[in-house]
A protein has these predicted regions:
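Active-site loop immediately N-terminal to the catalytic Tyr-X3-Lys motif
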Residues: 3-4, 54-58
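Active-site helix of classical SDR
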Residues: 26, 63
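A short helix-coil junction within the Rossmann-fold of NAD(P)-dependent oxidoreductases
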Residues: 28-39
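Residue(s) in the substrate-gating loop at a strand-loop-helix junction
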Residues: 47
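Active-site-adjacent segment of SDR/Rossmann-fold oxidoreductases
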Residues: 52, 73-84
Length: 167
């Protein structure tokens, strides 16, 4: 939810799970990936929210931008170890997680916000396919789903439109 609707515990948990978890996972995986290199690949989960800061999801977007930046940096940093680092960037994945509330002080499901915005849900199977393609492909970031692709185009070619749409 919006930054000011999150209490400190919720904000800390979001950062801990979405960014610190990725950092800790990367650090733990590195020795194993290095031992099986070349051909090793660390796959991170960023988000379409890492393409353009999403109003109402400011802290979530910030953590996913951090994952995107970490992915790019580690891909170069670990090149000498024979480890490739990439990410998938899904938009809204059609899971039970979207049935949950926006935050602790709301009972409004996240799904309602996505539907109201006219955005599409991506089936879980498409995310699995994209993960396979990411690990076996050459792109550093793999967009997943129609909403992610639309967001990438709009963020690149129409950032003013993105700001107006968010209001």
């Amino acid at each position: 939810g919006p930054l000011m609707d999150l209490n400190q515990t919720e904000a800390d948990q979001l950062i801990d799970i979405n960014f610190r978890g990725v950092v800790n996972g990367a650090r733990a995986a590195h020795p194993w990936l290095k031992a099986s290199a070349p051909g090793s690949c660390l796959l991170n989960t960023a988000s379409a929210s890492a393409l353009y800061g999403t109003a109402g999801l400011a802290l979530y977007s910030a953590t996913k931008f951090a994952v995107r930046g970490l992915t790019e940096a580690l891909d170069t940093e670990w090149l000498g170890d024979g480890i490739r680092v990439c990410s998938i960037m899904p938009s809204f994945i059609d899971t039970a997680l979207l049935a949950g509330p926006v935050n602790a002080s709301s009972n409004r499901p996240k799904r309602d916000i996505v539907v109201k915005a006219g955005l599409e849900f991506t089936p879980v199977e498409k995310v699995a396919e994209a993960a396979w393609e990411a690990v076996h492909g050459s792109r550093i970031h793999t967009l997943v789903g129609p909403t992610a692709r639309k967001l990438a185009l709009a963020a690149k070619w129409a950032p003013a439109y993105m700001r107006k749409r968010a209001q």
